[in-house]
Amino acid sequence: MKYMITSKGDEKSDLLRLNMIAGFGEYDMEYDDVEPEIVISIGGDGTFLSAFHQYEERLDEIAFIGIHTGHLGFYADWRPAEANKLVKLLAKGEYQKVSYPLLKTTVKYGIGKKEATYLALNELTVKSSGGPFVVDVVINDIHFERFRGDGLCMSTPSGTTAYNKSLGGALMHPSIEAMQLTEMASINNRVYRTIGSPLVFPKHHVVSLQPVNDKDFQISVDHLSILHRDVQEIRYEVSAKKIHFARFKSFPFWRRVHDSFIED
């Protein structure tokens, strides 16, 4: 079996990575960071997100595993003290694949510029580059509202536990193939109105943001933020692709939520 291990880069994570590579050396395991079948992330959720995007073109061939070396990582099932056990289990190849939905976003620009497509594990947020953020929200080609505020966040089910949660969005179980749109400081008065609530969209729904005035936006895909100019449309939909996790033990989603936000 081919595997690779990525580390947060701190001393604790780097040492654990080296120890695991040495442990895998005792089994029929090949280190391959080009075409791995297993990707192990050591660190926190930021490290995991980086690993996801590094291999997002090979998601169907990869199963991910997270080991948290700091605060509890939402995508990490394992602690450093369990690393030796994980090595032995992986060497046996006895694991189940659990899949989570992802978010696909297409950004369309003015004439002459090729559109860009992004895949998000947590969320994709859109904000103004400086001026007022005003966009028309269109759902399945039907105009829904004109939004004015700081920005909008579209999240995956697993991503609802991230930025979406801080915006007051609902938490969604990742078995639900859907996406959730939450507002960032919307303007609501006698003149301007928005729905003022998070919106959950099922698979096959398409949500479009169409600029009204300013067409330059700061778009963040998970942990990566880029300024996009001359944006004509931003289209969200549940991706046909999924991320796969290698699971060796039961760790129910709501137990994960409990341990992350209430108590460990």
Language-model regions, residue ranges each:
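Short beta-strand segments
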Residues: 41-43, 66, 155
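Short, acidic/small-residue loops that bind anionic groups at enzyme active sites
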Residues: 60-76
